[in-house]
Amino acid sequence: MKNWKKITLITGAVCTILGFFLLIFGLFAGGIQYLTSTDLGSFNNSDKSAAKVQKLVTEELSPYKNLDVSLDSLNLQVRYSKANTYALSYKNTKTSKTKSTTPITWSQSGNTLKIRERNLKKHTWFHIDLNFLICIFGNDDEKEAVSDEDMVTLYIPKNAAFDQITLENNDGNLLLNNLRTSQGIIHVDDGDIIFKNCALRNTLLTSNDGDVLSTATTYSGNTAITCKDGDVLFYRAADVLKPLSLKLETNDGEIIVPSSFSGKVKEKDDKSTYQQNGRDGYGTLSIQSEDGDIVLHA
């Protein structure tokens, strides 16, 4: 082996070993806690000396029956509370010892909770993302703190049921768990909508650019899903959808349903349709996709 190649190989090996020991030392010296609380890549033109530290804020809420949420770029998550209470959490960005930036405004009036995303001043910034280190070396609480970044989380009791929900998001995802409502309007412009263990009745759902995923979710009344550019995927769907009247249509995609369903998929040119007559007393679910598949997994 040539001398310069040997020197390069030895130098690389030494740097790799040294870097590994420095990484381990940094982790045990409090590096994970630093990563969870500090944005290493933020350079705010208006205040370059201020480190921007994200703090997870949790607000206790009174019980409510109506939910009205409008967000621009934040993700919204609804999940049941281990304490069986109502709460709201979000990341608060601290710019100095005395100043902080709250990404949302919220209010409760009567039985209605209203949440709005603030129109914050935009700054030029460069971001260094080292959150993968937290996912590898962090504990469960630290991993959850990372997952809450750019996320508004609503905690609700397991048996909570809403009379009316209105959820709108321009450029973010909706992750809805254990959400039950008698009536609802859900719209996402550019993002995915994910349901799990939900119960939706008389709900109108629209998505311009993103997928809709539903797992173990029941539908009743008259519910409609319209997706312009994205797939509509149902999992664990046979038991919950088989009794319903189904109207499925896609202009540029496939329709796949379990073989146990009574209807038949019809195809003509690029258009596919499926219709199923449900049992008396059960609701109707209509799904229309302009450019995407509709797949019902048993």
Regions found by a protein language model. Name each.
Residues 1-82, 125-127, 133, 137-140, ...:
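Alpha-helical transmembrane segments and their membrane-interface anchoring/capping motifs
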Residues 71, 97-111, 234-249:
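Generic detector of contiguous secondary-structure segments
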Residues 196-207, 211-298:
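Short, surface-exposed interaction patches in beta-rich subdomains
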